Amino acid sequence: MVTRDVTIKNSVGLHARPATFFIQKSNSFKSSIWVEREDRRVNAKSLLGVLSLGIVKGMEITLVADGPDEEAAIDALAELIDNELDDLK
């Protein structure tokens, strides 16, 4: 199991369009992947789950992956959050 804390930097957070791209990226991996915020954990492959966290700019979330490609999954999702979501407003 691999975990990584990331801070949301894009202006709109993880909702609507950015969340859709996050879910698509999550679904490209075989590992089970979760997003944690405070005391809640949701499936990173579930749009409704991710949207229910109400993730906005400046929030810190934890990415958790467990499976055969867990390292690659965490690296790719952290990269997406850190560098690619601002273009998806």
Where are these regions (language model features)?
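C-terminal structural segments of small proteins and small subunits
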Residues: V56-K89
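Compact, glycine-rich, soluble single-domain proteins
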Residues: T7-L48, S52-K57
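Intrinsic-disorder/low-complexity, polar/charged segments enriched in Ser/Thr/Lys/Arg/Asp/Glu/Gln
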Residues: M1-D5, E60
